[in-house]
Every structure is written in C-alpha cells, then in structure tokens.
Amino acid sequence: MTIAAHTLGCKLNYAETSDLLRRLAADGNTVVEWDHRADLYIVNTCTVTAVAEKKCRNAIRQAHRQNPDAQIVVIGCFAQVAAPEIEQIPGVTLVLGNDRKHMLPQIIRNEELEIRNSATQSSDATITNSSLLIPNFQLQYSGEDRTRTFFKIQDGCDYFCTYCAIPFARGRSHSATIEETLCMARRIADSGAKEVVLTGVNTGTFGQQHSESFLDLLKGLDNIEGILRYRISSIEPNLLTDNIIDFVAHSRAFLPHFHIPLQAGSDHVLQLMHRRYDTALYRAKLESVKAVMPDACIAADIMAGFNGETEAEFQKTLEYVDSLPISYLHVFTYSDRPGTAALRLGEKIPVPVRHEHTARLLELSERKHRAFIGSQLGKVRPVLWEEGERVKVKGETEGDSHLSPPTSYHMLGWTDNYIRICRPYDDKLANTIENITLTTDNILNVNE
C-alpha cells in the first residue's frame, strides 16, 4: 500500500506523524510525498485555532481530489474533538483521536480500515471530561532529517488557559520516566541525528506523575554521547526556573535559544486568560536568561484580539513587548474554541480589529528580529549544516539551471542561537558544526 501524510500544527504533531510513518513502512507499506497519488492518506490535525481547523478540512479535500478512490484517515487534535463533523467530509474513511491514533498500523494489519466506525468512538464529538482520559504516553521522534530531530518527551496539559482547547484534545500532562526517555534519546543518537528539539504540549511539567523533574531530565540528556545540540521547543515562564536557566548556560549541549509563551502584555488580560504569571515575572525570566546568555534568542507567543481586551490594553502589550529583549514573535489571532471559558469573557473583539492587531504585532516582530540579527553581525557562532537537497538563494533562478553546477547551490544551517545561515554547498560539511562569522551575506532573515 502507498501512504502519504500531511501534518498540521505543532512540532509535536510532526514527531508523531514521522513515528507513525516509520511504523507503517516497517510493515511493508511505501511512503510517498503528500502531493503524490496514494492508496491511503493520513491527515494529522490541529485544533488550536479556527484557521487551523479550516486548513485540516482543506487538506482532507485535497487528498480526496488527488485520488477519489483512496482511503483517508484523519487523526490528531481536531479528530479528537470533532469526529462527527469530520466523518461527513467526502472521502473520509476513519477518524482516530489522540487516544487511538497509535492503533492505525494495527488496524491496517488487521484489514479493518474498510470498517468506517471501527475507531471513531475514540473521539468525543463534544468537549467533555471523558476526552481528558488519553490513556498512554508514547515516546516518539521525527526521523526524516538526520540533522535535526523533534523528540516528543511530554504530552497533555493541566493548565486550562481560558482560550485553549488542547487539554481537551490531548488530556492531562503525562510523560515517560527519565530512564525511558534517556533510552529513546540513545536510539536517536544511534540514528546519527546531531540536534534534538525537545517537544511537548507543556514540556516543563515533564515527570510530575513520576515525582521526577524536567531539570533532571535535561541533566541526563546532556550526558548522552553523539547528540551535539538540544533545543527546548517551549517552556512556560513560571516553569523556567533559575536552576534551568543556569544549567542551560553552562551545559555541554543545550543551546541559548528559548521559546517562552507570553500571550499578552497586560496583567488584566493575563488574568482573564488564567495564565500563571504576570508581566513582572515574565520580564524577570528574560532578564535572567540574558544575564548569563547575552546572545540568546528568545521567542514568544502572543495573541491578538482576545475577548475583553481593550484598545488600551493592546497598546500596553505593544509597548511591553517592545521593551523586552525578545528576538521575534509567534503571533496568533484569537478565535473562539468550543467549550473553553473564554467564550464567557468580556466583549468580543471584531474580526477586522483582530486582524489589524495581528498585523501590528507582526510588524513589531519583524522589527525585533531585525534588531536581534543586527546585534549578531560580526560575531562568530557555531552552525550545524543540514543534509538534504541543495537550495538556490540570493536571486538565483530556475531558468539558470543550465548554468548551475553544484558550486552555485547553497546549504543551510542554524546557529546555536537560531539564526538561519547559508553557504556554498559542500557535501563534506553536511551534519557537521562549523564556526562562522555572521555577515549580511550569509544570514537568511527567516523564522521557522
């Protein structure tokens, strides 16, 4: 059977899709690119915003257009909370929520895929407490890229921020033990990957049900031979302790790159969101990072148009973010999520105003990122060069292909503090680290 998959949403989803495809390939199936004709299409979905859900529907319809006779399996967060709706989309064969998506290889082996409702009961049609009972945790990692791997170390969340449906889609916080996680990390090292990105829904809560700590996991990972770099994909500000900051600053392999969600620069709005910090604590965390890692890259999530936010509070957010040593923003436009407490909060912001606020935050992000890049010019930073296809940059065109020997192509890499770098392609450098002086000629001004 030929299988193609499309992943929407977070790095956690990418790790899960990759692991699923690896298991399906081990069963003798052939994995093809998403835009190829396939016998089976898998859509791993996201429910974080209404826009994300729209993209999920579009992906399902695209698969059906590519091969109307193909079977389509929809998995993930949107599948967990909206199975009855998804089942009505033409072409959908099976809907598996987060609690049973790991069963797909077994379903295919047992030739049960034709039975439309064989696992749809796993996804609650509405957001209820029963959907919080996601039963087991599986350590998973992405495997397509030998340079950089996304490693799922934690799942679920206990925070129940008023705007967020993810705890209903993924359950409460759960993880493996440190020993089990380190064992999987050694397997990743054996695969040849040099950089590992630790992913989860709320990574800082790792190990709580085992009376273990995230910091102790970091210490164990730092001792694993073969892995040269680790990044923490995201950590809540109230969980980013001084001990974690100090450890990262002096560790062997953890990089000066943090993603610290903010969401708003107004204490009143943060309270409405049920965030577990205020602006004073958030500023203190960033100052602590910069005190020991002055060149660290710090990214932040920010939300535009949350219910009840006034224009004055939005302006306060702009001014607050502008005053922080933030390198760039991930901007989300608020949308109502069924079953969340935010539906009952304050006056709804008109959609055009939400989009205007989003645009202003994106402009601020661009300015902050340019300033961060400018602060790094002339400095020497270690770059991990990526394997993979050669890319054309700096104005080269496809029409010049007859003039394009390998030396006209470039390879890409990331500095330790998350700046995108390019250089003329050299196969010998792939998956190695090289110290590079940063200039306007070798920096690509992109965020990923």
Residue ranges of model-derived segments:
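Conserved SAM/AdoMet-binding glycine-rich loop
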Residues: 72-73, 81-82, 190-311
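N-terminal [4Fe-4S]-dependent radical SAM core
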Residues: 108-150, 441
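Conserved alpha-helical substructure of the radical SAM core
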Residues: 168-197
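Generic structural signal for well-ordered alpha-helices
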Residues: 60, 185, 218, 245, ...
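Canonical Radical SAM [4Fe-4S] cluster-binding loop centered on the CxxxCxxC motif
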Residues: 144-179
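Cofactor-cradling patches in redox/metallo enzymes
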Residues: 1-112
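Radical SAM enzyme [4Fe-4S]-AdoMet core and its adjacent flexible, acidic
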Residues: 10, 207-226, 273-276, 336-367
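Terminal RNA-binding accessory module
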Residues: 344-402, 406-448
